[in-house]
Design a protein with these regions (language model features):
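NTP-handling and nucleic-acid-processing catalytic cores
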Residues: 1-184
Length: 184
């Protein structure tokens, strides 16, 4: 007991005690954080809702069609991810131009019940790295407009972990709700 402060001091001096940040699962009813094993203990496959939504790029008159399996995290959306090595298509739909992963185009258009569209061009996901977009709820969430002005907020990233075989091949990332998203 009386030696605990000394142990902490030595650990800090030897650089084995550090301070950092990470996302931790939290149980509101227990009012405590949960370990990875506690979170995984009750794991079972369930049907989750997914959501497609549009975000407009700020430097082009085009919309990214983004997919998420966690719609409740949209309010804390900070980035949109592309796979740098995969192909994405610019698609004319009515009076708008959408960007969708090429592999998922036909399946997505069937799911969205869109029959009248035209592919305009194809580009690699790496071409979208670092572009700013406008969050769809920008005027509806307190403080979001201020955060959106930050250089590294509401930007597109190109990362190999993005799965182009699901959704639209463009995913939303919410560092406030996912450890992997936070680590980016």
């Amino acid at each position: 007991p009386s030696h605990n402060p000394e142990l902490l001091k030595r650990a800090h001096e030897n650089d084995i005690l550090t301070e950092g940040y990470r996302v931790v699962a939290y149980c509101p009813s227990c009012q405590t954080s949960l370990s990875h094993s506690e979170v995984n203990q009750g794991y079972e496959m369930v049907q989750d809702p997914s959501l497609y939504y549009k975000v407009k790029l700020q430097d082009e008159d085009v919309y990214l069609i983004v997919w998420t399996t966690m719609p409740f995290t949209l309010v804390t959306d900070a980035m949109v991810g592309f796979n740098p090595d995969e192909e994405y298509v610019y698609v004319s739909v009515g009076s708008e131009t959408w960007i969708i992963g090429k592999i998922r185009l036909e399946e997505f258009m069937k799911e969205a019940k869109m029959e009248d569209y035209k592919v305009l061009k194809t580009v690699k996901g790496s071409e979208f790295e670092g572009k700013k977009y406008t969050h769809p709820l920008l005027g509806n969430i307190s403080g979001l407009e201020k955060m959106s002005k930050q250089e590294n907020y509401h930007i597109t990233i190109a990362e190999k972990f993005v799965d182009v075989n699901a959704g639209t091949g463009i995913v939303h990332l919410s560092p406030a709700n996912g450890e992997d998203d936070y680590n980016i």
